[in-house]
Amino acid sequence: MAGVSPAVFGCPDVTLGRNTAVREVQENITSVDSLTLASSNTDFAFSLYKELVLKNPDENVVFSPFSICTALALLSLGAKSNTLKEILEGLKFNLTETPEPDIHQGFRYLLDLLSQPGNQVQISTGSALFIEKHLQILAEFKEKARALYQAEAFTADFQQPLEATKLINDYVSNHTQGKIKELISDLDKRTLMVLVNYIYFKGKWEMPFDPDDTCKSEFYLDENRSVKVPMMKINNLTTPYFRDEELSCTVVELKYTGNASAMFILPDQGKMQQVEASLQPETLRNWKDSLKPRLINELCLPKFSISTDYSLEHILPELGIRELFSTQADLSAITGTKDLRTSQVVHKAVLDVAETGTEAAAGTGYQNLQCCQGVIYSMKIYFDRPFLMIISDTNTHIALFMAKVSNPESDENFLNVEYAFPQVLEIMPEYRSVCTCCLPCLTRQ
């Protein structure tokens, strides 16, 4: 933290007018309610997922769509003209139906809801701006970032990259309970601003697995390959269940003790690509509407830890967000001039699933699940082949995390239960990558 001091809208000012603002949003959210934002969030999540899978079809995937959306929406406060339009439409908002101010008000409402203390489920999310000490930021941009996204602001000396890197990494580590310790490995001296968004999730299964029942078992990577992994087991579990015959997959929902749940999608052998191609907001709604409590005689789920790193500046253009990374970028609402562009967006996620619960940092994760199927004959569900996972907040219907488990053995650590996905934006001539959710970096053009 040495060499850095809080800026105008640092943490102590975050609550200024916040309660009144939240009440106003709660009373006036008509164009953008939680369901509208949830639908856009899900649409973006599935679109990004398909791009990630397209590049690495047989690898694990873990990311926090909500964290990435929040970071980009916050950055859009500083964008104008086509740059602004591309960001918001890339996040799957219909600007004809949903005006830009309503989008930001909706995020403010959701961020406040998620920050409320819950019953045994801890969700912590926040944003921070690290600004080059000589860079003049418009007061309007800083105030909107504080009021709408609860963003803290700090000055940093990017001419001393080691000190600036330590400042940012310490901030992220402190706010993700140490789950993400090195978001950034180095910083370019041309960096002018780094935007960080983090999300930390920790929950306990309503029906935890018994560690004594966990044993090594086969996980089939494909028709010809398998690995031995720790397999958790729970018997006689009643939980929401749906068999989707059209898409050839089984859907099970495992609930946490608070306002969160994990949905597991198990495609039939050889049907993963069919399910992935069908991922749409309507698909998720159909699954949720079709889930019914069923008795599952035996449910087996791998105990695992997986992690991923993504440079999103190479992927977001496929979703229509292009100008942000070019010399045509208009981020003049940040400084008053068109002298900034985004050089890099990095997303890092860690997901651990174990018997008792889930812990995540700026990302997604969940543990201990249970499910059931109401049928006359014995029902057994084995997650012994690649499957999908979606962790959602049940109050807002927001998809906090999404994952594809292709190989539970890809990481060595199977013991802890945690998820980490911070998001950072760095503003500089070339986008700088960071470890955790999403990191946009801004540099001078």
Swiss-Prot record:
It comes from the Eukaryota. Gene3D superfamilies: Alpha-1-antitrypsin, domain 1 (2.30.39.10), Antithrombin, subunit I, domain 2 (3.30.497.10). The record marks 371-372 as: Reactive bond. Glycans are attached at residues 28, 94, 174, 259. Signal peptide: none annotated. InterPro entries: Serpin_CS, Serpin_dom, Serpin_fam, Serpin_sf, Serpin_sf_1, Serpin_sf_2. Keywords: Glycoprotein, Protease inhibitor, Serine protease inhibitor. GO terms for biological process: response to bacterium; response to cytokine; response to peptide hormone. One of its GO terms (cellular component) is extracellular space. The keyword Cell division does not apply. The keyword Transcription regulation does not apply. Residues 357-382 are annotated as: RCL. One of its GO terms (molecular function) is serine-type endopeptidase inhibitor activity. PANTHER family: ALPHA-1-ANTICHYMOTRYPSIN, SERINE PROTEASE INHIBITOR, SERPIN. The reactive center loop (RCL) extends out from the body of the protein and directs binding to the target protease. The protease cleaves the serpin at the reactive site within the RCL, establishing a covalent linkage between the serpin reactive site and the protease. The resulting inactive serpin-protease complex is highly stable. Variability within the reactive center loop (RCL) sequences of Serpina3 paralogs may determine target protease specificity. Belongs to the serpin family. The single human alpha1-antichymotrypsin gene (SERPINA3) is represented by a cluster of 14 individual murine paralogs. This is Serine protease inhibitor A3F. It comes from Mus musculus. The gene is Serpina3f.
